Amino acid sequence: MDSFKVVLEGPAPWGFRLQGGKDFNVPLSISRLTPGGKAAQAGVAVGDWVLNIDGENAGSLTHIEAQNKIRACGERLSLGLSRAQPVQSKPQKALTPPADPPRYTFAPSASLNKTARPFGAPPPTDSTLRQNGQLLRQPVPDASKQRLMEDTEDWRPRPGTGQSRSFRILAHLTGTEFMQDPDEEFMKKSSQVPRTEAPAPASTIPQESWPGPTTPSPTSRPPWAVDPAFAERYAPDKTSTVLTRHSQPATPTPLQNRTSIVQAAAGGGTGGGSNNGKTPVCHQCHKIIRGRYLVALGHAYHPEEFVCSQCGKVLEEGGFFEEKGAIFCPSCYDVRYAPNCAKCKKKITGEIMHALKMTWHVHCFTCAACKTPIRNRAFYMEEGAPYCERDYEKMFGTKCRGCDFKIDAGDRFLEALGFSWHDTCFVCAICQINLEGKTFYSKKDKPLCKSHAFSHV
């Protein structure tokens, strides 16, 4: 545990909330910090344990006593805090390959499981191994041991693309054993070592190059993991906006003159309106194209025939839009299909703001107080006008009368004596008993229980 001392200069609010206490059998700790508050600027963190308040041991204080102690500090608050050290994981030992890795050498013409073996066939009396270019014969004393070696062949570690013995037997039975075995190719490549003796003459077999392992593209993370303000933005009492962009015009593809196409068109034999897949035919006039042409929406056009269906402008350059089978230039498409701004009633041709089930220009949807564009941030509605979070909290935010903290969305609160209170802050000013749902008295805007109704405050 790391203990330290923090001194905050007054006046209140101090910018933090407490949780726990002797009455809860939980040590006092910091449960919440006000962003940019005095406690946050002094380095206090959520979860820090409170050891003492102005020199008094906090372990013997109840929750209410700790709050009263903090309120009584006036212009200077001294806190003794303790912070748990993060647990560091033990360093892992690096895995090092063995000094002398095993080497394998196979005969060039040997193939794995050339002929299928029935499961009940007796094993051979001895086995043949090849090591460093020499043949070694090892007798097998017992047939059951050989059978055990065959059965445990599938248990050996193999590359991810390797096939088991049972799978190769099945490939032989189904007639697919001619297919190349990736396991055999992998073992051949990994076991190539220089030989001192002259190799036996064998036919050269070209080896295919296997592509290296590809790094999988990272999957898109969910928004609540990427955006740290996701939860705050979509709180129940907030409204969010969505930014989109108006459709961008497509561009036709120009193709240069091709001699083979011109010759095929001039050679005759096909009708003027037919298209055999080699000769381009204009989709507008249905005539063979003998020169430059454009390709758009899967059809070929004479450059002068590809025009806007509304104004007749040639669309060879500048892009176009397609809507319900008709082609439009960008200006005609904006006039006819672009959405209108809910404020200025003009067409929106750039970024579109979606808010309150309407569309807006980005510069038209602004905070009613600071006139700053809200863009893709959360906002509050008050009397039919949008406000950014900062101005809304400044103008309409509700604070607790007891602890002077803001009452956030989801907090339980009550209204009494003309003020708002957290449910845990509405207590008797003398004995600190909770007065929620109970009869109480007031003196100098402070709640009192029945027992202290006539006490001096």
From Swiss-Prot:
Matching PROSITE patterns: LIM_DOMAIN_1, LIM_DOMAIN_2, PDZ
Keywords of this entry: Cytoplasm, Cytoskeleton, Developmental protein, Differentiation, LIM domain, Metal-binding, Methylation, Osteogenesis, Phosphoprotein, Repeat, Zinc
Residue ranges of the region described as Disordered: 82-166, 186-226
Pfam annotation, one family: LIM
Residues recorded with modification Phosphoserine: S78, S111, S247
Phosphothreonine PTM sites in chain numbering: T96
Biased composition (Basic and acidic residues): 144-157
Gene Ontology MF, one: metal ion binding
Gene3D superfamilies on file: 2.30.42.10, Cysteine Rich Protein
Chain segments annotated as transmembrane: none
Annotated function: May function as a scaffold on which the coordinated assembly of proteins can occur. May play a role as an adapter that, via its PDZ domain, localizes LIM-binding proteins to actin filaments of both skeletal muscle and nonmuscle tissues. Involved in both of the two fundamental mechanisms of bone formation, direct bone formation (e.g. embryonic flat bones mandible and cranium), and endochondral bone formation (e.g. embryonic long bone development). Plays a role during fracture repair. Involved in BMP6 signaling pathway.
Domain topic, free-text comment: The LIM zinc-binding 2 domain (LIM 2) interacts with TBX4.
PANTHER family found in the cross-reference section: PDZ AND LIM DOMAIN PROTEIN 7, PDZ AND LIM DOMAIN PROTEIN ZASP
Name of the protein: PDZ and LIM domain protein 7
